[in-house]
Structure formats: structure tokens, C-alpha cells
Amino acid sequence: MEIDGGNDVQILDPELLQLPGLSPVSLKENPHIAEELFSQWLSLPETGRLVKSLIDDTKSSTPVSVSKNCTSLNVACGSALPSVFLNSGTPPLSPRGSPGSPRFSRQKTSPSLQSPLKSVREPKRQLIPQFYFQHGRPPAKELREQCISMVDQFFSNYIDGLHMDEFKSITKEVCKLPSFLSSVLFRKIDTSGTGIVTRDAFIKYWVDGHMLAMDVASQIYNILRQPGCKYLRQADFKPVLDELLTTHPGLEFLRNTPEFQERYAETVIYRIFYYINRSGTGCITLRELKRGNLITAMQQVDEEDDINKVIRYFSYEHFYVIYCRFWELDGDHDFLIDKENLIKYGNHALTYRIVDRIFSQVPRKFTSKVEGKMSYEDFAYFILAEEDKSSEPSLEYWFKCIDLDGDGVITPNEMQFFYEEQLHRMECITQEPVLFEDILCQIFDMIKPEKENCITLQDLKASKLSGNIFNILFNLNKFMAFETRDPFLIRQERENPTLTEWDRFAQREYVRLSMEEDVEEVSNGSADVWDEPLESPF
């Protein structure tokens, strides 16, 4: 609305604000009279000019000051206000006072006589430090200067830049990252593929790109992921494993066997995704990477020459066990196994019903493109779940198998369905059978579920004995070992309390496989070998 600021009215007519004389009581009982008075005041030309002036100041972003505009308005209005209450007994108090008040003066106007807009002071604005950074928090000044100083020292002898084989010292000493990430980081900076990383290019990526201020997990995550992706795929880890195989002294013996190098890299990646990718999507998020222990394992493997001492993910012995167990089951060596192959696992330890559930792809969809066949990756997930039932990924894997109707709980009927085959197998080998009613009581005593008639996944995760439940239901050999309290297993647990079930299994299996390989080498050896005395292993 356009406010007319013309000068047609030079003098304020006090009669415009005249109302009949009212007593204070009458005014209190009739509040609409005060509203009418305010409406009349708004209609005055002087008021219009004041409002227009304030609007113009606001539009022009200039400080709002109404002292000039309202001085004459105050005077004119002040002379008119007493006539409103001509017949009242006692004049009401006014914030502007009366003409006779010593506070009222043309020459000097106190703050209380000015516009209410002026009297309300704006609170001082407090400077809130920036807490969101679209590209990450920039590094502190001292950290930035320290990093640049180190970079200058490294590049002082390489004015034209560093080649890939010269870049490893930057990765390890400046970036504080595992050395086998060097080639991936190099290519991340050298986007044009020149084969050289200059000082300015490194500063732009590592310092100006705020990589310096990130935690190690975020740094590795951003180095490995593809542009535009918010997750890590299996292929993103392949260059890292390739460099590890090329540079790590503990894997040097594999350099002449590229096939086994490839299998080792695949197995490590499968183990990483089995434990880290808890959502099962095949894509590792930054949150999952931070929650897992992969970063610690990567740092450890970079410092340890003996790869087998890094039992998380990278142990060659663990790879050897997984690969050899798969190879034993894969009779035709087409790198695929079927139900009949898997039923032989662990000396026919598993029941047909649980194998059917696995091949129904209930716990996990197969990556194999051949129907009814399990690939090496699928087997890696299976063996990790079977031999480490105390881990959460394993509990989730087997819980899906036992939960026949997929309602999120395991009922006594579902447990009985799987235990029936166990009971039949015990009868076949003349083993004294254990009735299901007794087993059910034992299971509920071990788990102590929140509800009496069913078991949830959370109930299993809260109990340290959960793995035994699945052994009771579908693994006869482990069930018998649990019932007899195998002294060998008990002694092994006491000797290495920090090891997981998988670690102990891999340790035993590697010894067994090594002994079998030694025997095979002896049997295929020369006549000279047969002449040497052999000590009995027992």
C-alpha cells in the first residue's frame, strides 16, 4: 500500500483526536474507545509520513531512527491528549506525560518521549561459531602450517613432482596412512593421469580439500570411494589389495602364483564385507566403516612383517583354510558347489534341512549365476558363519535360517522342525537321544529370552551361549562336543581367551591341512626321501 507523504497538512489539528469526556471507569468498561482513538491517530498525515519514513529506511537497509520524524508528532499529539479526558475526575497516567509536565519539552526530548520502536533496544548479537562445513571442517592453523612445512621438505628435491614409486613416503609420514594406500591416493590426486603429483596438487587435495582435518576412517573412505558415490564397493578395495600383495614382505612368496594372489585378495575382501557391511547391501557406508575394526587391522598389517599375526581379515593362514575347505568340497573343481557337496562339510555334520535353507538363499542371496550352485564368495560367508557362531553376523545368518515364517522370532515349533532330524541321526548312530522337551528347557535356560514362548535376535545377541543353540539344532558333531564338554576345546579356550571361535578353528585346520600336505609331499617324493626315518606325529 502506497502511503502519501505529501505536505498538504502542515499543522496537526487537535480536534481530530477529540472524544467525549469519559471517566476512567467508563473507559475501562469500553476498551473499544481506546482502539478508536488509536485508529484516528493512524489516520493522521503526520503518522503516515512517519510510517513511510520507517519503511524507506528498512528497504534501504539503513539504521532505523525515528527521533527526527516523531518530534513534531509528539508535540502535536501531546497538546491534544488532555482534551480526551476533559470531564474525568483524575487524569490517567500517560507514557508521554502532559503539556504541563516538566519532562515535556520541545528542546530536549527524553527517550521515553520518543517512539516505542526506539525505546526497545535490540539485544546484542552473539557470534556463534560456524559448526557446519559442506566440505568438512578446515584444519587448524597450526596443523595446516605444520603439514605444509613437511610437504615442502619432501618436495624440496622434487620440484617437478613425485612419481608413484616415490610417493609412498608422503602417504606414510605426511598423511599418516598405511603405505599400501599410496597408489590409490596418488591416482586420486593425479586426476589427469600425468604420472606425477606436484606440491601444489597435493596441497590442494590434502590441505585445501580439508582431508587433513578428517579422522583416519573418513580419510580412507574418501580415498577409496568413487566420485559421486556414498559407499564403498568390493571393487574399491581391489587396488589396495593388489599393492599389499606387491609390497608386503609376508606375501612375497605369492608373487610367482598370480592365481593365488587373486584368490587371497578376494578372500580378504569377502571377510571385510562379511564383518563390516552389517546391512548386507554389498556397499559399506562411512558409518559402518567407523563402527568396524578394519582401520585398526590395516594399520597393524602395515607395521607387521608376519602377515599371519594380523588375524583380522589379512591372515594368509585363514585364507588358506577357507580356500582349501572349499577345494575339498568342489569335486569337479569348477569353483561351484551344490547341496550334495555342502552336506559333506565337517564330516557330514550338517542336517539336510539346514542345507536346504542355505540353498534357498534365505540367509543371503547367492552371487553365483548358476541355479542351485554356491560360489566361492557364498561359501566364504557360510564358513565364517558356521565356524564363528558367537559373532553377530553369524547370529543374524542362522537366525534367518531357523525363522521359517520370517516373523522375527524363533518359536518352539520352528526349533523342533530342525531338531527332529538331529534326533533321527542320533538314533541311527545308536547315540542316546535327547528329547526335544529337555532340549527346549536347556535352550531357554541358556538364552533367558524376554518372552517365555519365543526367542528374538536381540535375545541371542545378549547371550554368550547363543552359538550353542544352533549347534544343537543342526550340527551333530558340535552338539555332541558340547554335550560331552570336549576337554581339548576347553583347554584351547583357556589358553587363548582373546581368540574367537573362528580364530581357534582356523588355527586347528591350518595345522591339519599342513600335516596332510607334508604327508602328500613325502608320498610323492624321491627314493631318497623314503630312506630317511620318519617320526610318528603321535
Swiss-Prot record:
**Gene Ontology terms, MF aspect:** calcium ion binding
Which residue pairs form cystines in this protein? none
Record field: compositional bias (Polar residues)? 107-117
Q: Where is this region: Disordered?
A: 88-120, 519-538
Q: Where is the signal peptide?
A: none
Task: Name the source's superkingdom.
Answer: Eukaryota
One Gene Ontology CC term in the entry: mitochondrion
UniProt feature, compositional bias: Low complexity? 88-104
Q: Where does Ca(2+) bind?
A: D403, D405, D407, E414
Q: What happens when the gene is disrupted?
A: No visible phenotype.
By its UniProt entry, which InterPro entries does this protein fall under?
Answer: EF-hand-dom_pair, EF-hand_13, EF_Hand_1_Ca_BS, EF_hand_dom
Arranged from A to Z, the UniProt key words for this protein are: Calcium, Metal-binding, Repeat
CDD domains in the cross-refs? PPP2R3A_B-like
Q: Where is the EF-hand domain?
A: 177-212, 264-299, 390-425
| Residue spans of biased composition, Acidic residues class | 529-538
What's its job? Regulatory subunit of type 2A protein phosphatase. Not involved in HMGR regulation in seedlings grown in standard medium, but negatively regulates root growth in response to salt.
Query: What is its quaternary makeup?
Result: PP2A consists of a common heterodimeric core enzyme, composed of a 36 kDa catalytic subunit (subunit C) and a 65 kDa constant regulatory subunit (PR65 or subunit A), that associates with a variety of regulatory subunits. Proteins that associate with the core dimer include three families of regulatory subunits B (the R2/B/PR55/B55, R3/B''/PR72/PR130/PR59 and R5/B'/B56 families) and cell signaling molecules. Interacts with HMGR1L and HMGR1S (via N-terminus), but not with HMG2. Interacts with PP2AA1.
Q: What is this protein called?
A: Serine/threonine protein phosphatase 2A regulatory subunit B''alpha
UniProt source species: Arabidopsis thaliana (Mouse-ear cress)
